[in-house]
Amino acid sequence: MAKAKEGIGTDWQAFSNIEADNNVAALAVLGYRHAWENANVFLGVRNVNEDFFTSDATSLFVNSSCGIFPTIAASYPIANYPFSGLTVYFDVSRNGWTFRNSLYNGVGYNGWRRHDNPFLVRPKEDGVFNISQLEYSHRDGHYFAGVAVHSRQFAVDEEGELLTESPAAETSCAWWAYGEQPLWKTEEKSISVMAQYSENTCHSNACSRYGEVGCVYQDSRNACGLSGQYALFQQGREYSVEMTWRRQLTRSLDVQPCCQYVTNADGDFFVVCARLCYDF
């Protein structure tokens, strides 16, 4: 991924991961996985986006908060895209229920240097980060609840800047609940609604509260979505609205334009972007 030197907008949630720093050959997943009939175990390099915070509805939207809650992503420098870290992960499924758990190094990395690579394990300096999630699926509805615990605290000021270079050796956590449910469904078409909410127990962290509601229409070749988001940062409140449409052009090629309106203490922003997806 590459981008220009100047950012596109000054929104706080990050309207898209395209705003991430330039990366060349950053390692996302590398490790050993063992699978049983109802369980999986993974040991190696991994990031949180591989296993958490994604669903049929949220994966349509471009805003970064639909990929991971800002109460976590903005508050902790964890193995969240474009960073990864050493991980012990497992999941167990039974009768519509799934439990997932991952234990990570407290800070994620994406370099190839001695002191900047995803193979580092430094609990004394970086702390440890654990994330657990319980899921339930029933009649095409999906429901999630989880908690993330970090053994370090990364407090920021009202400008969103870290108060100290070294994190405090204090434990804090974030919790969330999320659900999506079809309202109408035929053999090829469906309309679903979704809602999610999250809080961070430490109000000195970058983001302490987040919520979103939205709806998605899908058929054999189209997916359209509308969502509204709210996030409480140290700098203030941010509100955003996203409209997006994904169109399947061929069996392997999709195009997806997107419009977002964002308002916060820094101003009002309107962003238009598009992504091209190729499956092979």
Identify the residue ranges that each predicted region occupies.
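Detector for outer-membrane/organellar transmembrane beta-barrel domains
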Residues: 99-102, 137-232, 243
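Loop-centered beta-sheet repeat module
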Residues: 91-154
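Outer-membrane beta-barrel "beta-signal"
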Residues: 268-280
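Outer membrane beta-barrel
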Residues: 1-106, 205-212, 223-233
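Membrane-embedded beta-strands of outer-membrane beta-barrel proteins
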Residues: 30, 88, 132-134, 177-179, ...
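Outer-membrane beta-barrel translocator domains and adjoining extracellular loop/strand segments
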Residues: 5-10, 54-60, 110-118, 154-163, ...
